[in-house]
Amino acid sequence: MLARGLPLRSALVKACPPILSTVGEGWGHHRVGTGEGAGISTKTPRPYSEIPSPGDNGWLNLYHFWREKGSQRIHFRHIENFQKYGPIYREKLGNLESVYIIHPEDVAHLFKFEGSYPERYDIPPWLAYHRYYQKPIGVLFKKSGTWKKDRVVLNTEVMAPEAIKNFIPLLNPVSQDFVSLLHKRIKQQGSGKFVGDIKEDLFHFAFESITNVMFGERLGMLEETVNPEAQKFIDAVYKMFHTSVPLLNVPPELYRLFRTKTWRDHVAAWDTIFNKAEKYTEIFYQDLRRKTEFRNYPGILYCLLKSEKMLLEDVKANITEMLAGGVNTTSMTLQWHLYEMARSLNVQEMLREEVLNARRQAEGDISKMLQMVPLLKASIKETLRLHPISVTLQRYPESDLVLQDYLIPAKTLVQVAIYAMGRDPAFFSSPDKFDPTRWLSKDKDLIHFRNLGFGWGVRQCVGRRIAELEMTLFLIHILENFKVEMQHIGDVDTIFNLILTPDKPIFLVFRPFNQDPPQA
């Protein structure tokens, strides 16, 4: 967080006026008010070329970017640039030029121009791999009508409220097993508590959860002996993310030409992801074909196959993308949430009180409990404000639009700097503070176009509802069973590895909460 965990940001706040903390001050560029209609003016818009910029020489900019080790601190760079240039700026790195915005009203205006088939920025090394090796693609990479066709089907099976109800009995036991694992660790340590970095355990938890939802079967990732084939998949996903960053600003044509170790490792990671996902999908596909009746919900794979609204190749491609996207993202958010709770014990007690009251009122019915924990759900939003998975959201507007009195041509890459927004006092009071109650405010203007952790609109994260349910259930069981503390009082900074990760291990202390274990 700013004062405690982000020294750079703290220095910036002291050295520079807060972003938009006073309308019109500290910017040097005209800005209409921050209320309704902010960002829209009746004046003749200024040309795109006048948008503040560090310069139009993309390769020189990229040289300085690399020299300053900007790849892993790009989220801090956004903050610096907004302080320097104002609420909108453009930057060219190599061949890629983007316009960056931060104000929620500008974000709302941008999304009005996303069109029927919103387009995001495709991560170059990912796209290059799929093209070079002719891999099938799902909604992550599809565009226009083919994207829409798949997305409509997935919305029914993955996002709809009726579908989410089916996931509860699949995800809840995984969270309970994670709690059991921690209790075993406490007994093994023999000190009445467990102290450790549970990053790997959270990877296992997330993979066990997403595979259970996809296939309706457990893989045993929370057992004493972890499935080695499943571990290879998890390791490959980690390597895929980690090797993406050095390749982001390199022209894809050079990947195969120079065959650098980073590119070879990236290809090997994707190969493993596809091979393992194909293997799992085929095994469960054949198993499902042999069954005629199911006592319980059989998983997303079966429902997609049964609906016959997708070709088998498209089903496999989308399953692969959801498996790959469901490990590091959810596990990292949970790690950050535990970190924030451990540093804000008063908030942790508020959350625990809500959960325990919900358990009593719902008489143990977990489905009812999920409707009674608004503060807990708000705490997930708060974690994603401070530690968003992606540091920006991207759109290519369908037609010309005006932002901050500048004309933005159609199909310009516009990036919403959600990390910088979440850390700015103009948009969040006391932004350093972990305060879930801010999301329960009756003043909707305080949260308007600020909850962007999962994206927005029809192209928001397809796994959003699964992730929200998975994290809520996990936190319910953790709060009922343990008090979570930091082993050492100190700050943890963030680095950009395509997703935001801690710059060092986070060692947490889990102390059993003095009560009888809740009955499922």
Curated annotation (Swiss-Prot):
EC class of the enzyme, as a word: oxidoreductase
EC number: 1.14.15.6
Cofactor(s) annotated in UniProt: heme
Keyword set, alphabetical order: Cholesterol metabolism, Heme, Iron, Lipid metabolism, Membrane, Metal-binding, Mitochondrion, Mitochondrion inner membrane, Monooxygenase, Oxidoreductase, Steroid metabolism, Steroidogenesis, Sterol metabolism, Transit peptide
UniProt: heme binding residues: C461
Localisation: Mitochondrion inner membrane
Keyword Heme: yes
Major subcellular site: mitochondrion
InterPro entries listed in its UniProt record: CYP11_CYP27_families, Cyt_P450, Cyt_P450_CS, Cyt_P450_E_grp-I, Cyt_P450_sf
Molecular-function annotations in GO: cholesterol monooxygenase (side-chain-cleaving) activity; heme binding; iron ion binding
Catalytic function, reaction form: 6 reduced [adrenodoxin] + cholesterol + 3 O2 + 6 H(+) = 4-methylpentanal + pregnenolone + 6 oxidized [adrenodoxin] + 4 H2O; 2 reduced [adrenodoxin] + cholesterol + O2 + 2 H(+) = (22R)-hydroxycholesterol + 2 oxidized [adrenodoxin] + H2O; (22R)-hydroxycholesterol + 2 reduced [adrenodoxin] + O2 + 2 H(+) = (20R,22R)-20,22-dihydroxycholesterol + 2 oxidized [adrenodoxin] + H2O; (20R,22R)-20,22-dihydroxycholesterol + 2 reduced [adrenodoxin] + O2 + 2 H(+) = 4-methylpentanal + pregnenolone + 2 oxidized [adrenodoxin] + 2 H2O
Membrane topology qualifier: Peripheral membrane protein
Residue interval of the organelle targeting sequence: 1-39
Pathway the protein acts in: Lipid metabolism; C21-steroid hormone metabolism; Steroid metabolism; cholesterol metabolism
GO cellular component: mitochondrial inner membrane; mitochondrion
Keyword Lipid metabolism among record annotations: yes
Result of altering F233A: Impairs the hydroxylase activity toward cholesterol; increases the electron leakage from the electron transfer chain
Purpose: A cytochrome P450 monooxygenase that catalyzes the side-chain hydroxylation and cleavage of cholesterol to pregnenolone, the precursor of most steroid hormones. Catalyzes three sequential oxidation reactions of cholesterol, namely the hydroxylation at C22 followed with the hydroxylation at C20 to yield 20R,22R-hydroxycholesterol that is further cleaved between C20 and C22 to yield the C21-steroid pregnenolone and 4-methylpentanal. Mechanistically, uses molecular oxygen inserting one oxygen atom into a substrate and reducing the second into a water molecule.
Quaternary structure, from the entry: Interacts with FDX1/adrenodoxin.
Family according to the record: Belongs to the cytochrome P450 family.
Protein name: Cholesterol side-chain cleavage enzyme, mitochondrial
